[in-house]
């Protein structure tokens, strides 16, 4: 929940993210190290609260900051203005509101992602050498490669880079320093179709519409209805394994 420190909260949260209006450089601000460490923990928690408020604001929920600070003070002092039952029901109400608002925002984002993806594909399709398949996949063949044609059971080894249409990179085997080995049947539809246009040693750019990628689901940080761009290099092919 939002009103207590979650498991993901870290006392080492990046203080540099806090928007400080000023930094006082007075000496002897703290009487001892425990005071200093307590202050640092407070800054880190405050940073987490600020980030949480900003995220909630984006989905249309704005809680009162002063009330939150009073709640923190009362929790520390033990002087609560609400019963435990009221607190419990309030947390459930807040959780329900957050889930509802998040659901609405995700639908809105998914619709916008789809529209922007179609626009990107329309522009990309006009580039020299780009071809479009009947399924809607766009591809640009950079190097055909040689050898056997790929089948669904083919085991392949590839290097690849995946980006969103805004240029955000979400995966890159080159940066990890090792290629990926898998079977063609286990990849997303856009890969399965697009990789059959190259052979061992080939290289291709795929622009994959949502229905050939992850569709309306958000997967590993990839937003729903995202059009995906992949640069793929086919390093090795093993058929009949």
UniProtKB/Swiss-Prot annotation:
Molecular function terms from GO: peptidyl-prolyl cis-trans isomerase activity
EC numbers for this chain: 5.2.1.8
Function: PPIases accelerate the folding of proteins. It catalyzes the cis-trans isomerization of proline imidic peptide bonds in oligopeptides.
Residue ranges occupied by any PPIase FKBP-type domain in the UniProt entry: 153-241
Keyword vocabulary terms for this entry: Isomerase, Rotamase
Protein name, as recorded: FKBP-type peptidyl-prolyl cis-trans isomerase FkpA
Catalyzed chemical reaction(s): [protein]-peptidylproline (omega=180) = [protein]-peptidylproline (omega=0)
PROSITE patterns: FKBP_PPIASE
Species per Swiss-Prot/TrEMBL record: Buchnera aphidicola subsp. Acyrthosiphon pisum (strain APS) (Acyrthosiphon pisum symbiotic bacterium)
Designated gene of the protein: fkpA
Family that this chain belongs to: Belongs to the FKBP-type PPIase family.
Any one Gene Ontology BP term: protein folding
EC primary class: isomerase
Domain of life of the native organism: Bacteria
PANTHER family attached to this UniProt entry: 39 KDA FK506-BINDING NUCLEAR PROTEIN (PTHR43811:SF19), FKBP-TYPE PEPTIDYL-PROLYL CIS-TRANS ISOMERASE FKPA (PTHR43811)
Isomerase recorded as keyword: yes
């Amino acid at each position: 929940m939002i009103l207590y420190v979650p498991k993901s909260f870290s006392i080492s949260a990046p203080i540099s993210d806090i928007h400080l209006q000023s930094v006082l450089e007075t000496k002897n601000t703290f009487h001892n190290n425990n005071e200093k460490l307590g202050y640092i923990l407070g800054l880190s928690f405050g940073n987490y609260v600020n980030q949480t408020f900003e995220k909630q604001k984006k989905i249309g929920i704005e809680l009162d900051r002063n009330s939150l600070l009073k709640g923190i003070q009362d929790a520390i002092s033990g002087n609560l203005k609400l019963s435990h039952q009221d607190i419990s029901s309030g947390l459930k109400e807040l959780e329900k509101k957050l889930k509802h608002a998040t659901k609405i925002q995700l639908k809105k984002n998914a619709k916008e992602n789809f529209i922007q993806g179609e626009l990107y594909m329309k522009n990309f399709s006009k580039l020299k050498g780009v071809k479009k398949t009947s399924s809607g996949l766009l591809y640009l063949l950079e190097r055909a490669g040689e050898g056997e044609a790929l089948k669904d059971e083919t085991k392949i080894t590839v290097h690849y880079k995946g980006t969103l249409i805004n240029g955000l990179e979400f995966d890159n085997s080159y940066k990890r320093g090792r290629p990926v080995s898998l079977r063609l049947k286990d990849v997303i539809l856009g890969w399965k179709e697009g990789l059959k246009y190259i052979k061992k040693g080939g290289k291709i750019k795929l622009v994959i519409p949502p229905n050939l990628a992850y569709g309306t689901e958000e997967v590993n940080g990839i937003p729903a209805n995202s059009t995906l761009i992949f640069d793929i290099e086919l390093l090795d092919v093993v058929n009949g394994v």
